[in-house]
Amino acid sequence: MQNAWSKNTVQLLDTTSRPYTGEVLVPFSLDEAYARLCAKDPAMPSLVHLWRHERAMVLGSRDAKLPHAVEAIRELQMRGYETAVRQSGGAAVPLAPGVVNLSLVMPARAVDLNPEPFFVQMVELIRAALGTDGERMHSGEVAGAYCPGSYDLAIDGLKFCGIAQRRLTRAVAVQAFVNVEGSGREYGEQVSSFYRVAAQGTTVHNYPQVQPERMASLAELGVSGGVSGFAARIREGLNAHKESAIAVMDSCPPWLEAEAGNALDALKVRNLLVGS
């Protein structure tokens, strides 16, 4: 299996100092474009991508198929949310200035069909970034949390991070949301409100039964440093892998931006199918 740190260079794109305010698909298109480049060229260095958005709700594909998904999305948009359906798995996740999105994009051999090692790399990167607080962190599905999954990350039983994965034939993008600041309960209430509208009329509970009190932010869990501190600790965690040089970027390079434009068009087409 390809290890993210086995390359001579790791690209770090960190735009957390300037949260996105427009289309939330834009940062996802950067991940998608880089993954496509990795699929074509196994010599591409791994990319670690950190970003934030001012106000958005990112949905999973199953969310988009709920009976009143279109109505729920329109309601969110009227309240000032950017909305999108992402390529990776998972379910609805709210984005805000206190939420850091962390992606790990790398080449992967076509025979590496087991997704777990890639999830583990993300888990260990976050654990290292939390320092001694990482010793308190546990992975495993948190009942009642939004966007539930086998690699939920929690401290004291409260989820602060969820991880999803997007697979291409020869590349992988592991994407995490990390509630660094803000109220986990409020984030949970936003998701619960979406499902109350989107799931009207369904008798099958094929969507997360969200209990907002099962969510928290790192700040609420006693982890200091805020967004800037978390981003800095991710960089420190990368630097701990002495065999890799870190190429740091605080804005998208032109060569990637051009590729991302094509990926964005494809993602927009997918999003036109919401509710169908």
Residues covered by each model-derived region:
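N-terminal lobe of the biotin/lipoate ligase/transferase fold
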Residues: 1-113
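Short amphipathic alpha-helical segments
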Residues: 26, 68, 114-122, 226-230
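Short loop segments at secondary-structure junctions
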Residues: 64, 107-109, 158, 182-185
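Contiguous, small/hydrophobic- and glycine-enriched helical/loop subdomains that border
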Residues: 99-143
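Long, positively charged amphipathic alpha-helical accessory segments at protein N-termini or as interdomain linkers
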Residues: 133-135, 170-276
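Beta-rich nucleic-acid/ligand-interaction surfaces
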Residues: 139-159
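Aromatic/basic-lined ligand-recognition segments
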Residues: 157-165, 173
